[in-house]
Amino acid sequence: MKNICTFVARNKMKKNLKNIFARTWGLMMSTTATWEDIAEENSKENDSFLRFVLPWIAFSTFIILIFDALYAEVKFVETGFVHAFINVIALLGAYYFTLAITSSILKKNMSGIYSVIKAEKMVAYSFTVIYVLKVVAAVIPSLFFLQILDVYTVYIVWEGCRVIFNIDEDERGKIMLFISLSIIFTPMFIKRVILLMLPAF
């Protein structure tokens, strides 16, 4: 019985990892089609967070812990753990802050189409580029200039607003602006604030 449970758990984890990779790749390479798949997916509240956001935060944090420790000139272990901790706080804070902004805007201006689950999907998957670039920059710091690709988040959000909420172009522009700016800049802001409180790092 124990072996069966372990097998089922492994299969479920493997399936979830494949789904995360497929969604990540799809949103960057075939944005519209992937959003349509996400929109059709039956989800419960917090599913997008648990199945996509949390695994990505855990993975990026692990990579940052390892590589920041390896690249540190002094205080190897401390540097790795501090930067990993900052990553967790920055990404979690950015997710919940952006979700709050998205929910507030939609409730105020489009209460008829607002749904908690749809808002979670919209925000969770729109962080895709941010997560990928976090990992790339941690592994190869010299590629820091790739952060400019954060702007692709704007297109992901634009298509997400259309597919998930069926918002027309006029309204979509305003919502897209707030969501995109929050996704791109909130992690940076939180990281900067924490670093100011930790001058040794």
Q: What is each stretch, according to the model?
A:
Residues 186-201:
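Juxtamembrane boundary at the C-terminal end of a transmembrane helix
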Residues 8-9:
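Acidic, Ala/Val/Gly-enriched low-complexity intrinsically disordered segments
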Residues 103-188:
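Hydrophobic alpha-helical transmembrane segments and adjacent short intramembrane/lumenal linkers
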Residues 60-61, 65, 183-189:
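Hydrophobic core of alpha-helical transmembrane segments in multi-pass integral membrane proteins
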Residues 66, 70, 139-140, 193, ...:
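Helix-loop junctions at the membrane-solvent interface of multi-pass transporters
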